[in-house]
Structures are given as structure tokens and as C-alpha cells.
Amino acid sequence: MNEPLYLYCFLIFIAAGWVKGVTGMGLPTVAMGLLGTVMPLAEAAALLVIPSLVTNLWQLFSGPSLQVVLRRLWLMMMFIVIGTVVGSFMLVSIPPLWAGVGLGVALIIYASYALCRPAMHVSARLERLLSPVMGLVTGFVTGATGVFVMPAVPWLQSLRFGRDELVQALGLSFTVSTIALAAGLYLHDAFHVRQLSLSGMAIIPALLGMWLGQKIRARIGLRLFRLCFLLFLTVLGLEMISRPLLA
């Protein structure tokens, strides 16, 4: 990596950590979207592993409901691992230009869902039936694009968790997705010691950005910030989808 690229990555992780500090999520989504503009997605995903793992473990252990969350979600988490390891083959084998298209589609689908915010509530019976399916699909999307949010986020929001439980449930899903993605990349020879050290260096700007985001969260209009963030993801997704047409 040359010096301008180091600086760009440093700023990306500050921005991604800042978004997570303000909203409680978004670090992998922002980081993958922006890193994907300057490097292959497999490299971007490898760079993301440690800062994503550290910040999501922080979120996972931030409340008192870990045992409750684990009891409800262990089966979904198991299928996230399976889907991610399988899907990661696509991330390392598809040409970077077309992998970027997949990431762009994932960003737009997530932003569209979050902008519309349809109200969904799932019964206990459907939860038992669909949790493995949602885990498998989330894992496959994670493995193929490096983005953890679809359909895990809307699914977890539909399960009627309390506020603190939902924060920990999201932390659990993102933590498992991060570990599974690292395992998938390693199995496909796309995660090496050099990338581990670079990923470790990214912890500092990510935590700095997260701290800044938490500091200013109470001072900014969260609704307006969220709208601008989702519109930004949509524009970024459209740009990634358009690349093959402009190549």
C-alpha cells in the first residue's frame, strides 16, 4: 500500500467508526463501500476483520442480556457461519468489478429497506422455522459481499427484542459474521499475516471514530443524519453498479 492509500484507509475507518458511534451500526457497511472503490473486495474484507471484530465485541458485551440473546439466536448464528464460508468463495473468485456490483446491490437493498422501515413482527413459531434460513442467507450475503446487514438487521428488528437486547443481538450477529468471514477468507487463501497486521492497525482510527460519534450523538439530529447516511449508501451503491458500464 502506498502512502496516499494508507491515509485514505485511515480516514475511511475514522468515518466508519464515527457512523457506528452515532447509529450503533454501519462500520462494515461504510468501510466495505468506500474501500471497495480503491481495492478488490477480498482485500477490503480482510482489512475490515479486526476493527469490525473489536467494535462488535464491545457492542456484544455492552449489556446484561447476552445469555437471553444466545439462547434465541444460536441456531441462526450457526447457519450464518455455514453461509459465510460458502459465500466467501464468490468474494475471492468473482472478478473485482462484478464483485463490486454485488456489493452495490446489497448497499441499495439495505438503504431502501432502512428508508422505508416496514413494520414486521414475527411469531415464535415462525422464528423457529425461519431463523436457520435467515442465518444462511445472511451468511451467504456476508461471504459474497463483506456486508453483514441483510437480512439479519430487519430480521432481528422483527423479533421484539428490548432495546438493549437488540443492541446485543446485532453485536452477536456482526461478531459471528466477522469471525466467519475471516475463516472463509483464510480457507480460500485470501487472508494472510500481512493483512492481519494492516487490519490491526485499522483498530485505532475505527475506535477513534466510534468515540467521536458517541460524543456528538446527542448533539446532532439523528433522523436527518440517518437519512443522509442512507442516501449516501444508495449513491455509493449506484456508482458501484455502474462501473461495468463505464469500464
PLM region descriptions:
Residues M1-V38, M120-L170, S177:
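Selected transmembrane alpha-helices and immediately adjacent juxtamembrane segments
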